[in-house]
C-alpha cells in the first residue's frame, strides 16, 4: 500500500512547533488594507496557534495522526 500524501494546502498553511503545537497565520492581511488601522494590521502580522477544537483536523490533513 502506498504512503499517505500530505494535503498540499495544509502543508503551505501550517507549521509544527518544537513542542508539537501547530502555528498558523492570521487572515485579512492581503488586500484592502487602507481602512484597517495600523494597530490591527500589526496584530494580524504575528502568527498564532491553532485552536484546540481544530487541532485534530489539521493533524489529520498533515498526516500526523
UniProtKB/Swiss-Prot annotation:
An example Gene Ontology biological process: translation
Gene Ontology cellular-component annotations: cytosolic large ribosomal subunit
Keywords, alphabetical: Ribonucleoprotein, Ribosomal protein
Domain of life according to the entry: Bacteria
Disulfide bonds: none
Family per record: Belongs to the bacterial ribosomal protein bL35 family.
Protein name: Large ribosomal subunit protein bL35
Family annotation (PANTHER family): 54S RIBOSOMAL PROTEIN BL35M, LARGE RIBOSOMAL SUBUNIT PROTEIN BL35M
Pfam family, one: Ribosomal_L35p
Transmembrane parts of this sequence: none
Gene3D superfamilies: 4.10.410.60
NCBIfam families assigned to the protein according to its UniProt record, in alphabetical order: rpmI_bact
GO MF, any single term: structural constituent of ribosome
Originating gene: rpmI
Amino acid at each position: 500500500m502506498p504512503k499517505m500524501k500530505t494535503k498540499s494546502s495544509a502543508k503551505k498553511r501550517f507549521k509544527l512547533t518544537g513542542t508539537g503545537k501547530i502555528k498558523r497565520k492570521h487572515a485579512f492581511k492581503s488586500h484592502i488594507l487602507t481602512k484597517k488601522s495600523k494597530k490591527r494590521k500589526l496584530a494580524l502580522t504575528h502568527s498564532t496557534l491553532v485552536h484546540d477544537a481544530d487541532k485534530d483536523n489539521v493533524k489529520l490533513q498533515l498526516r500526523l495522526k
